[in-house]
Amino acid sequence: GGASASGLVLGASLGTDALHDAVAAASRQGALPRRADAVVVGGGISGLVAARELARKGLDVVLLEARDRVGGRVLNHHLSGPGTHGATIESGGAFIGPTQDHIARLAKELGVPTFLEYNQGNSVYVSSLTGRQEYSGTVPPDPTILPDAAVLLQRIDSMAAEIDVAAPWSHPNAAEWDAQTLGEWIRANAVNGDGVENLIECWTQPGFGADPNELSLLYVLWYVACSGNESNVGTFSRNSDTANGAQERRFVGGSQLIPLRLARKLGDIVTLRAPVRRIEQRDGEVLVHSARGVVRARRVVVAAPPPLVLGIDWFPRLPARRLQLLRHLDMGQLMKCDAVYRTPFWREAGLNGFGINDSGAARAVFDNSPKEGEPGVLLAFVGGDTWRQYGVLPRAERRRAVLEGFAAMFGERALHPIDYVEHDWTKERWTTGGPVANYAPGTMVRFGSAIRKPFGRVHWAGTETSTYWTGYMDGAVRAGERAAVEVGERR
């Protein structure tokens, strides 16, 4: 009891809601300073990391966040109903895996431990042709697609291994690969192209919030190549798998503890409810106009999702290539739907809670239970075409469709949760989708080289600008660190 009175211990043990209140209380309440060395736009993980690194260099920093909270695409949800044990689940980015060294280091520094995603037992595959099967491994044992899928995934790995993660557009085949969608390439190279594409949708819908027909092949190869670090080549399985993959672990208490603890340390560097409306560069400085006032800075780091950058009024105008890039980057469409049960009953049946369905609302399903194992939580990623079909339905109809998808995998008990929670990222004004902004065909080769290129005194962060683990929390950390280095070198 007595030790918890110490501020440090108390801060470390605060849950999401209490930390959120503490961050809001510690953030800047009054007028903004008229001048700063650097302004960071965006209070997601990337912006917070950039602000911390700049402050560590001794710079006077102001961080402007549009929302009344920090975390961006990382968001905890606190369960409060009977039988839920007050558990926390993640409505946004959640997973961490091998080679995601930068987010791992940050979490360790902030005292946020990880736990293994439950992975004991079999996964479930539901096919509209062959019915329900239990399996182990990466690819379901569907005889109509397995030979094709194995060959194509091997080819994806070998093509991705040739990609320069810092300049994917420089590959000799870049123009050819960027001219086609992943879906077109699959159909051209598989005997059962439709079947393989249907399976790959169960990877692209959660991972990109998009379908194979929307994504440039070059972009997808780069995304796979990014699924590693400086000493480990990215592979499809490291991106898609649980064991030894990007879904291997989660954070105890939920991933939003990381940005919340980071923001609490930054104190009044953080200003909430301060959407940036105009950025003008003149006379060797940058004027940042926000809803909370104007700040003059020597440098600015923009760490907002690419589509939102278009909503800022720029003077002078953004360079043509940067403007075209932003216009061609589309946020994925994604929502997360969680059903909560008193226990993870599927584990009793020897199942790990992971499932793939080639149709319906619940195409890709994970065990989203907290570390303690209770309550049991099943999570469906509803993305891309599946979001377009089910995202428009009334909540009750969508809930029924998701639960029916769970029941097809795990039995009738899945129809009777004690709670149901959903979060539609397309409805978030300051994100507009998720989990990442994607490259349509023809975008990367023509405009991709602008992604990190500073614009005068403006630098770019955000997970989309990372050369490793783009689209992930690790990419967000890396991008924030890189942007801070750029600013430090150009003071």
Q: Which residues are covered by each model-predicted region?
A:
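FAD-dinucleotide binding site
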Residues: 2-491
